[in-house]
């Protein structure tokens, strides 16, 4: 991107223990795993955005994070997306908790208010575990069951810049705001 625009997205960042648990979930042989530090749950893919609008969004994210405490989110299943046989991703699908859905709706309203165009696909909470090669065949491991209970504890709402290079995609945090755990829930460790 040029100096006036960048590629951006907003995501929830799991804590380190959750990223380790997600990284340990089974994926198909030959899949390119997402590095643990890069595991995240995208709320809004923005794409190309002017720096000025990106700065405005960054200024509003901490207030949005403070307004939305989140419980731990259980992994419901492991799936291949978009669908077999054309799957490109292996994802951990997470429960669509009401608090998470409300946060996503608040973010969508903020993006509209700031005039920031975002992906209009329905919100499906997930974490991308791995990317599949173009010639991948097969089914999700264990019929999609994670094999053991995994709950994702979210620690931050983060605006990322997405950078493309010869080595692949990397994500650089622009601003990250803490998300409080919902009251009465102790995050699993």
Over which residues does each language-model region extend?
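Histidine-dependent nucleotide/RNA phosphoesterase domain, centered on the 2H-phosphoesterase fold
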Residues: 1-189
């Amino acid at each position: 991107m040029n100096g006036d625009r960048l590629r951006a997205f907003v995501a929830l960042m799991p804590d380190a223990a959750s990223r380790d648990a997600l990284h340990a979930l089974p994926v198909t042989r030959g899949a390119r795993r997402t590095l643990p530090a890069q595991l995240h749950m995208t709320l809004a893919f923005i794409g190309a955005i002017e720096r000025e609008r990106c700065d405005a969004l960054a200024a509003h994210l901490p207030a949005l994070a403070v307004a939305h405490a989140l419980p731990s989110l259980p992994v419901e299943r492991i799936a291949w997306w978009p669908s077999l046989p054309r799957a490109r991703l292996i994802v951990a699908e997470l429960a669509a908790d009401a608090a998470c859905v409300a946060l996503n709706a608040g973010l969508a309203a903020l993006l509209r208010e700031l005039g920031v165009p975002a992906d209009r696909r329905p919100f499906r909470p997930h974490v991308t575990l791995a990317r599949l090669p173009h010639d991948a065949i097969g089914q999700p491991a264990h019929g999609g069951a994670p094999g053991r209970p995994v709950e994702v504890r979210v620690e931050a709402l983060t605006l990322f810049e997405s950078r493309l290079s010869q080595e692949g995609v990397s994500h650089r945090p622009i601003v990250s705001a803490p998300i409080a755990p919902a009251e009465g829930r102790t995050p699993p460790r």
